[in-house]
Amino acid sequence: MEIKMAKDYGFCFGVKRAIQIAEKNQNSLIFGSLIHNAKEINRLEKNFNVKIEEDPKKIPKNKSVIIRTHGIPKQDLEYLKNKGVKITDATCPYVIKPQQIVESMSKEGYQIVLFGDINHPEVKGVISYATNQALVINSLEELQEKKLQRKVALVSQTTKQTPQLLQIASYLVERCTEVRIFNTICNATSYNQKAALDLSKEVDIMIVVGGKTSSNTKQLLSIAKQHCEDSYLVEDENELELAWFKNKKLCGITAGASTPDWIIENVKQKISTI
């Protein structure tokens, strides 16, 4: 099987930074899953004795805590600080940016519209910085059902698709007196998405490598399917199915921002033997 890799794929700056922080802070607790890749989390737990804790009330005062890349709600961060916990913040700088924008814009009286998945930890963290009621919408259709104020500030989950953000921005501009638009989709996400789109036009089959709970990985799969119907998401090489590759000659591979090189290489090696 011939293989072609996407021009841009895999670990982004924020994930690399977070993993380095975890490796340097052995025996620490991580507030929530550091990244959305179970295989890499297992490696960190095994080799560096870091453990995940979802409840801030269960974190002892004398324990070192790493804040996940997606960030955490403002009230949880303040709780840990008041508790006297030693905090190492691995929140991606690209996530901190929308947190700051939401806080400042809501203080200025703007209604916050956040384009993202309301159940995603990044979105939960970002929206907690709003000082007034904010809207979280995952599509233009959801926005069309909401009541908008005159002054609106639009931000996005960092892993969303730019064309959808532009549709939402256009809708707001047509209906609100004043609209502040902030493109908070991170550069790595945009590059990886464009590379996946370009590659999907050339290949017979696309394999997207990454965690099934990863937002940016699921976005890559959605993009790949636009031009390559036979696109599949796998967490590792063991999830590959031979039947997918029947009568296929050229396989494209891309990977989510939280997918380590060692997993990508294992997938690539197995496909090369088909």
From Swiss-Prot:
GO terms for biological process: dimethylallyl diphosphate biosynthetic process; isopentenyl diphosphate biosynthetic process, methylerythritol 4-phosphate pathway; terpenoid biosynthetic process. The keyword Iron applies. [4Fe-4S] cluster binds at C12, C92, C186. It catalyses: isopentenyl diphosphate + 2 oxidized [2Fe-2S]-[ferredoxin] + H2O = (2E)-4-hydroxy-3-methylbut-2-enyl diphosphate + 2 reduced [2Fe-2S]-[ferredoxin] + 2 H(+); dimethylallyl diphosphate + 2 oxidized [2Fe-2S]-[ferredoxin] + H2O = (2E)-4-hydroxy-3-methylbut-2-enyl diphosphate + 2 reduced [2Fe-2S]-[ferredoxin] + 2 H(+). Isopentenyl diphosphate binds at H36, H70, H120, S214, S215, N216, S258. Gene3D superfamilies: 3.40.50.11270, 4-hydroxy-3-methylbut-2-enyl diphosphate reductase, catalytic domain. (2E)-4-hydroxy-3-methylbut-2-enyl diphosphate binds at H36, H70, H120, T158, S214, S215, N216, S258. Its EC number is 1.17.7.4. Its cofactor is [4Fe-4S] cluster. PANTHER family: 4-HYDROXY-3-METHYLBUT-2-ENYL DIPHOSPHATE REDUCTASE (PTHR30426:SF0). This is 4-hydroxy-3-methylbut-2-enyl diphosphate reductase. The lineage of its organism: Bacteria, Pseudomonadati, Campylobacterota, Epsilonproteobacteria, Campylobacterales. The gene is ispH.
